[in-house]
Amino acid sequence: YINSPVARYKDELYNLPFNMNTFSKMWNIRTPQEAKEIIEKQRKETGITDPQNLEEQALFLGGRDIYEKLIKGYTEKQWGRDCRELPAFIIKRLPVRLTFDNNYFNALYQGIPIGGYTKMINNLLKDIKVELNVDYLENKQKYNSIAKKTIYTGAIDAYFDYKFGNLEYRSVKFENELLDIPNFQGNAAVNYTDKDTPWTRIIEHKWFEFGKDIDGNDLPKTVISKEYSSEWKLG
């Protein structure tokens, strides 16, 4: 599996990460030099030299077209905040590639375990005692007594019983649908970057397994998940 997401801005589709396929579609250009010149021109037009928030940082790094179509709406849905209210350091750099390469990662190897992560985790947990639906914070003494060291991976403010206040978390909700068609979007992940679409992305799970079941058979139906970002509230 190669991670090559697609961005959908209204009725326009763009390849991610930002590369020559993206720029060719956006500006009807063919060469890296053309893309470089457009990005540099748009960057200078902003007049920004010392970005003070995420919007200014994105404009400073990539220009207005990339920001307006592929960053602004998507980011504001994820964070639930106007980009001008978010700190600049969230986007330290933009992965702008002047090649026709849709591979999101540069790693030599990438993939997904055969059969998925559930199968892999089940294999890892063989002969290991697992307790589900228990709360460490309600049973600290019990769990601390059975091991020399305990690794806590829950909310850090809850660990301290909120005596320092509670942190602002974001949450994610998924809506799953089984569709009576073999192919919904032709790609594992499509990000919806306009602000008016309520979900941030749609995942079509079969494309993580090349559209086939574990026996290599084509699948006549497909499962999609719509991802929504939302505010998390205590209780």
Task: Give a label for each model feature.
Residues 7, 12, 22-149, 157-160:
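Active-site/ligand-binding neighborhood in enzyme catalytic cores
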Residues 5-9, 190-192:
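Short acidic-hydrophobic surface loop/beta-edge motif
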Residues 134-235:
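Mid-domain catalytic core of redox enzymes
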Residues 16-18:
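Short capping micro-motif at the N-terminus of alpha-helices
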Residues 1-2:
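Conserved FAD-binding subdomain of flavin-dependent enzymes
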